[in-house]
Amino acid sequence: MAATEQSLAPAGSSAPPSGKEEGAGPSSGTEGDPAGSSSTPEAPSIPDSSNPSATVPEANVKPPAAGSAALDLPIGPAPQGPAPVAEASPRSPPGPGGSRPGPETFRQRFRQFRYQDAAGPREAFRQLRELSRQWLRPDIRTKEQIVEMLVQEQLLAILPEAARARRLRRRTDVRITG
């Protein structure tokens, strides 16, 4: 619907569409229309693909709260030993020089979180919530898949070192079904 409204707007118009972004939730922030005519959140404007001269100024694009909140998270030393931690933005798409950190990296970040590093209980909750979302990805996984990940992680914790090493070498993206 927002794409239809946007195509109806004049090509030179700089007003953003007044629709609700599909992925917007309670954590995406609520900013009203500058004129105060609507209480729906402002969706970032998308350049019109038919008009090559239409560009979106960077100042109007606001990152979602969940994506920007993870940038200031403390990353402490690994309790099981030194583990390399990627310094890439957690929600950024794969770039030409690298790729998005994998679930194991996010699991380690979640497990390495220390309450003492947070500014208080609310900040600790916010950081743990963001770390768990990065690791478990509830936006793309079902509840059953999330529970399976948690059970596997707990099982790995009690396995002997040799079995754990074999399990970590195995490709988890390939599944044999029957």
Swiss-Prot record:
CDD domains: SCAN. Residues 9-18 have a biased composition (Low complexity). Keywords: Nucleus. SMART domains: SCAN. Transmembrane segments: none annotated. Pfam families: SCAN. It is found in: Nucleus. Residues 107-178 form the SCAN box domain. Residues 36-54 have a biased composition (Polar residues). One of its GO terms (cellular component) is nucleus. The keyword Translocase does not apply. Coiled coil: none annotated. Residues 1-107 are annotated as: Disordered. May regulate transcriptional activity. Interacts with ZNF202. This is SCAN domain-containing protein 1.
